[in-house]
Amino acid sequence: MAIVKCKPTSAGRRFVVKVVNQELHKGAPYAPLLEKKSKSGGRNNNGRITTRHIGGGHKQHYRLVDFRRNDKDGIPATVERVEYDPNRTAHIALLKYADGERRYIIAPKGVVAGDQLVAGNMAPIKPGNSLQLRNIPVGSTVHGIELKPGKGAQIARSAGASAQLIAREGAYVTLRLRSGEMRKVLAECRATLGEVSNSEHSLRSLGKAGAKRWRGVRPTVRGVAMNPVDHPHGGGEGRTSGGRHPVSPWGFPTKGAKTRANKRTDNMIVRRRK
């Protein structure tokens, strides 16, 4: 994998920094694991915008990724190829199991075509294998972590993400997340060893606004540039600073204000994120 800075042959190329991976599959994705993906433009069933800055972009197919891997315990799989996925920052790996079935998984870092992977509590400790947290050694790096047994991976799924298993006590293990948060998770939940691939994703630069539009991201307008009817920071004669602490268009504090309200799982958090 290489970081390539483009020559400034035009204004749109001047600031482009690309991540080039020669090992990625260059052909079409595996068709039986594709699904139609329709665009909402950020609107709900009433036609009202519920998520801003969404619209347009290139057509995409959704890749069906296996986040559970619990029905293939003990069945070895061979990595056929590692692919680009437009729906996520991580790469995905196409596995061919010994029973002939193919499935996509989130590609772990260092896993290449030809590698052998297996899921199950008797699986060896190597990147890409999926086990219950109770069977993973303390100090190991993991990703694709379940919060409820059998529900599928929910934590550490994006490019370069991982968590460290730092303690095991009774029915729970303690994980240190990349955010600095330490939380308890049931030891019977599954996780995949290693960290997620494409850790260089954060080093890329799209270089121009149009590249964002290709990805379906619309512009973000500053509140101080709006009218008073549109935003609490709007209005004023000439350029103004907003006149109050930064808030969202609906008046909620932004820029670092705590928004977590889920008291039901507070006892699972040993230490808050930084």
From Swiss-Prot:
Q: Does the keyword NADP apply?
A: no
| Family according to the record | Belongs to the universal ribosomal protein uL2 family.
Its GO biological process annotations read: cytoplasmic translation
Which Gene3D superfamilies does the protein's record reference? 2.30.30.30, Nucleic acid-binding proteins (2.40.50.140), Ribosomal protein L2, domain 3 (4.10.950.10)
The lineage's top-level taxon is: Bacteria
User: Keyword Disulfide bond: yes or no?
Assistant: no
Q: Which UniProt keywords apply?
A: Ribonucleoprotein, Ribosomal protein, RNA-binding, rRNA-binding
Q: Which Pfam families match?
A: Ribosomal_L2, Ribosomal_L2_C
This entry's Gene Ontology molecular function terms read: rRNA binding; structural constituent of ribosome; transferase activity
Question: Where does the record place the region Disordered?
Answer: 34-54, 224-261
Query: Which organism does this record belong to?
Result: Ectopseudomonas mendocina (strain ymp)
What gene, per UniProt, encodes this protein? rplB
Disulfide bonds, paired cysteine numbers: none
Q: What is this protein called?
A: Large ribosomal subunit protein uL2
**One GO cellular component, as annotated:** large ribosomal subunit
Primary role: One of the primary rRNA binding proteins. Required for association of the 30S and 50S subunits to form the 70S ribosome, for tRNA binding and peptide bond formation. It has been suggested to have peptidyltransferase activity; this is somewhat controversial. Makes several contacts with the 16S rRNA in the 70S ribosome.
Lineage summary: Bacteria, Pseudomonadati, Pseudomonadota, Gammaproteobacteria, Pseudomonadales
Looking up HAMAP family in the UniProt record yields: Ribosomal_uL2_B
